[in-house]
């Protein structure tokens, strides 16, 4: 069906090209999420290769063969994922052979590998499917970047078709060890991002004008982000010339509405220690509050080990600020520390779905070890005491203006009759505006509900948008300003029953 690719005819403006063929009924039926194509696109892009197409096909030999035949003749590299194995629906080798009009045969080296893994096998046994490859197949043994050792199992390629496994961990290991197979095009792509706090409709005309002027020299992508606390649109400039991309970025910023470009820190967690401690050394009022809070946290770390401390975390704005402070203090004190930051979550009845989603995102961002318990605070602490008797101190995001908190001190033992813990309160002297200034100065992610008019969050049964943030926009529609725009902080709890 297909002939061996003529590489020179599959270049695009001097750049190597690729197509990705994802094989598997489980993808098309929604049983499995495809992460392989995203990984491959990123990896190939870094190697200067333009991915022109991603196709998903079922485990049907004729369908796979047709796609392999068509795609392999139009791109420099065709990468397949999935359909390698001992079962009836693993038909990728057969399909590639059909595409190139070749027979399958038991490759001697593949046979040895199969026997070494499965033991003695017969020609008609299921494991032998792994050794049956197209006649012109080549075995490519990659090098593990971490160990420097040759990978045990090879990547099979046929002409310009590279047949990867479908299991993400195996595919990623194989690709990382064989990236040299796809390098050498000489192309380097240069990308710049611009974050804009404006709707796409407000900037669409400017973007069209700029793209028309640049033509094919620079590509401009516009991507709305409904879940960001700091921007509404991410603009991506892409070209193979660093001079062109820098020139385009300057033109883009000049063309956008004044004040709409956000100098976003895209990964505030990785620079937390540097940025938080830099802020603490400033002579601003916020800097002094940060320095005092860090002092309390550092005193706790002097007294307790990391494994004896946890952060009380429910996803609210105060404990989000506290978590970032504590994370910064830990990274400053133990830059190579392996202990995960521990957090205690007392789950309430009827939590907001947005809050639950934010909790899961936060666990990933900070690599938290989360203890989730239910019930009253006393019941929860009793349960934690049984499950984790080594914990001795709980960092809390309490402020002095919170109910029943005006007599607290930075270090407060729990009351008699309660489980024995030290309550550590680094934020006692912080105000509502201090919390928001800290979060937004450092671009720390927080629960999106705070951008929708909520100023204090509990459950869905007792939390409402704050009437003080209600407004009517230019279209006459009722909207709510974000929580950080609340002027009178004494009205903070007007959104709670």
Curated annotation (Swiss-Prot):
<dbReference type="InterPro" id="IPR036425">
    <property type="entry name" value="MoaB/Mog-like_dom_sf"/>
</dbReference>
<dbReference type="InterPro" id="IPR056596">
    <property type="entry name" value="FLAD1_M"/>
</dbReference>
<dbReference type="InterPro" id="IPR012183">
    <property type="entry name" value="FAD_synth_MoaB/Mog-bd"/>
</dbReference>
<comment type="similarity">
    <text>In the N-terminal section; belongs to the MoaB/Mog family.</text>
</comment>
<keyword id="KW-0285">Flavoprotein</keyword>
<keyword id="KW-0547">Nucleotide-binding</keyword>
<comment type="similarity">
    <text>In the C-terminal section; belongs to the PAPS reductase family. FAD1 subfamily.</text>
</comment>
<feature type="region of interest" description="FAD synthase">
    <location>
        <begin position="308"/>
        <end position="465"/>
    </location>
</feature>
<dbReference type="InterPro" id="IPR002500">
    <property type="entry name" value="PAPS_reduct_dom"/>
</dbReference>
<dbReference type="GO" id="GO:0006747">
    <property type="term" value="P:FAD biosynthetic process"/>
</dbReference>
<keyword id="KW-0274">FAD</keyword>
<keyword id="KW-0067">ATP-binding</keyword>
<comment type="pathway">
    <text>Cofactor biosynthesis; FAD biosynthesis; FAD from FMN: step 1/1.</text>
</comment>
<dbReference type="GO" id="GO:0005524">
    <property type="term" value="F:ATP binding"/>
</dbReference>
<keyword id="KW-0808">Transferase</keyword>
<keyword id="KW-0288">FMN</keyword>
<dbReference type="InterPro" id="IPR001453">
    <property type="entry name" value="MoaB/Mog_dom"/>
</dbReference>
<keyword id="KW-0548">Nucleotidyltransferase</keyword>
<protein>
    <recommendedName>
        <fullName>FAD synthase</fullName>
        <ecNumber>2.7.7.2</ecNumber>
    </recommendedName>
</protein>
<comment type="function">
    <text>Catalyzes the adenylation of flavin mononucleotide (FMN) to form flavin adenine dinucleotide (FAD) coenzyme.</text>
</comment>
<dbReference type="InterPro" id="IPR014729">
    <property type="entry name" value="Rossmann-like_a/b/a_fold"/>
</dbReference>
<dbReference type="Pfam" id="PF01507">
    <property type="entry name" value="PAPS_reduct"/>
</dbReference>
<dbReference type="Pfam" id="PF00994">
    <property type="entry name" value="MoCF_biosynth"/>
</dbReference>
<keyword id="KW-0963">Cytoplasm</keyword>
<dbReference type="GO" id="GO:0005737">
    <property type="term" value="C:cytoplasm"/>
</dbReference>
<dbReference type="Pfam" id="PF24102">
    <property type="entry name" value="FLAD1_M"/>
</dbReference>
<dbReference type="GO" id="GO:0003919">
    <property type="term" value="F:FMN adenylyltransferase activity"/>
</dbReference>
<feature type="region of interest" description="Molybdenum cofactor biosynthesis protein-like">
    <location>
        <begin position="19"/>
        <end position="110"/>
    </location>
</feature>
